């Protein structure tokens, strides 16, 4: 009798244990089935991959690639050591939205030790967590230490020496990660014209190259007097020395290759070709670049490149001074001709940017699927993977003139 009673108790315990285990497994599978995207088992570097689904647009499955880029040009994840000697260097091209992005770098990055930005001061202190040395070289951290809107030629020759002087010691082990923003050339050109029309000059820019600044003969002014305020668009376009023409190519290229600002160094056609190819190479080799017209994708690529997370999402604002300019087709064509090198560079950069975004998103999703597959083989694909699309402001097919959005962002913050 006792033997039968013991056997019954064992059978009941086994059944109870089976029911409990089965219920737990069923609930886990059901949870994954009805609520995919709700569970996160700790993505690397603090990324909430599933939560990002609503923030970052899906790559266009119908996007047609224009250029071939090997994997080494698409993969842009760097081992940025903020506690080491690594430095991010921001090359700020005029009227590309760089003011907004620069503010993001000093005010909107989630850091162990945030940048110290005090009211009334133009610069923030961005120290490493473990010592009083800067990890960021930019307008809002170190100021215009290499000159106002210093270009690639100036920065690469100036930054190491400036940091050695600031930190009072020589360092040969620093890694410099150059970053920049590009913008649709016509929109950028119009924005610069409106800025100059209001009195901006940038005449304190050094334009240092091969150890010297350009002579007045090499770089004649477009106007007489203190500024060019009130100039018409026609006057702006008519000046052959206007640095607004092809500004993005000039600021990204190695000017030493073409004799700096000496136009007689090599023939004009050869000079243009060398500048364009140099700008493409330097852009391709940079740790990161973004496009003003694609704020969310720019945020995504920066975060994945440096494994740094922004606190608040980037906003896409398209109501700018450039947007309010009504132009006829002839004027637009003339601006495109004056900025032919920039048009070619932007076409190249936009394709590289989109391919990098697609590559990184696909890689991330593959990693997520592999991570979830062993645990939940019956998991249904998240509907968010196929339903969310590019947000309207990041339209692929139209020109979206965007520039400095800080007033909007400050109000929202």
Swiss-Prot record:
Disulfide bonds: none annotated. During somitogenesis, first expressed in polster and presumptive forebrain. During mid-somitogenesis, expressed in eye, hindbrain and anterior spinal cord. During late somitogenesis, strong expression in eye and hindbrain, decreased levels in midbrain and anterior spinal cord. At 24 hours post-fertilization (hpf), expressed in neural retina and lens, brain and anterior spinal cord. At 36 hpf, retinal expression is confined to the ciliary marginal zone and there is strong expression in tectum, rhombomeres and otic vesicle. The chain crosses the membrane at residues 16-36. Residues 9-15 are cytoplasmic. This is Heparan-sulfate 6-O-sulfotransferase 1-A. It comes from Danio rerio. One of its GO terms (molecular function) is heparan sulfate 6-sulfotransferase activity. Glycans are attached at residues 262, 318, 329.
């Amino acid at each position: 009798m006792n033997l039968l009673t013991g056997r019954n108790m064992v059978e009941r315990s086994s059944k109870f244990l089976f029911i409990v285990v089965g219920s737990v497994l069923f609930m886990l599978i059901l949870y994954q089935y009805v609520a995919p995207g709700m569970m996160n088992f700790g993505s690397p570097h603090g990324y909430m991959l599933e939560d990002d689904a609503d923030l970052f647009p899906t790559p266009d499955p119908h996007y047609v690639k224009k250029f071939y880029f090997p994997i080494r040009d698409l993969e842009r994840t760097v081992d940025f050591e903020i506690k080491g000697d690594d430095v991010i260097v921001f090359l700020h091209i005029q009227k590309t939205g760089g003011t907004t992005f620069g503010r993001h770098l000093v005010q909107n990055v989630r850091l162990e030790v945030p940048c110290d930005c005090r009211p009334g001061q133009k610069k923030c202190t961005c120290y490493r967590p473990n010592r009083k040395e800067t990890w960021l070289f930019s307008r809002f951290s170190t100021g215009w230490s290499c000159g106002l809107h210093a270009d690639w030629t100036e920065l690469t020759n100036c930054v190491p020496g400036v940091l050695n002087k600031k930190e009072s010691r020589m360092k040969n082990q620093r890694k410099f990660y150059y970053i920049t923003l590009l913008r649709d050339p016509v929109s950028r050109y119009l924005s610069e014209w409106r800025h100059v029309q209001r009195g901006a000059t940038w005449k304190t820019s050094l334009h240092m190259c091969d150890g010297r600044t350009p002579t007045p003969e090499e770089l004649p002014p477009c106007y007489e007097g203190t500024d060019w305020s009130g100039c018409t668009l026609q006057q702006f376009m008519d000046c052959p020395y206007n640095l607004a023409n092809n500004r993005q190519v000039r600021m990204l290229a190695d000017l030493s290759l073409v004799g700096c600002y000496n136009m007689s160094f090599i023939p004009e056609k050869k000079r243009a070709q060398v500048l364009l190819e140099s700008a493409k190479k330097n852009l391709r080799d940079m740790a990161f670049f973004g496009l003003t017209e694609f704020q969310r994708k720019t945020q995504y690529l920066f975060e994945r490149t440096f494994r740094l997370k922004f606190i608040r999402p980037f906003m896409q604002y398209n109501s700018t001074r450039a947007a309010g300019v009504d132009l006829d087709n002839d004027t637009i064509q003339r601006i495109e001709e004056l900025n032919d090198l920039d048009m070619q560079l932007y076409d190249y950069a936009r394709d590289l940017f989109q391919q990098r975004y697609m590559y990184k998103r696909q890689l991330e999703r593959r990693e997520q699927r592999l991570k979830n597959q062993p645990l939940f083989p019956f998991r249904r694909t998240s509907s968010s993977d196929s339903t969310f699309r590019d947000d309207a402001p990041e339209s692929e097919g139209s020109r979206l003139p965007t520039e400095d959005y800080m007033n909007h962002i400050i109000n929202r913050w």
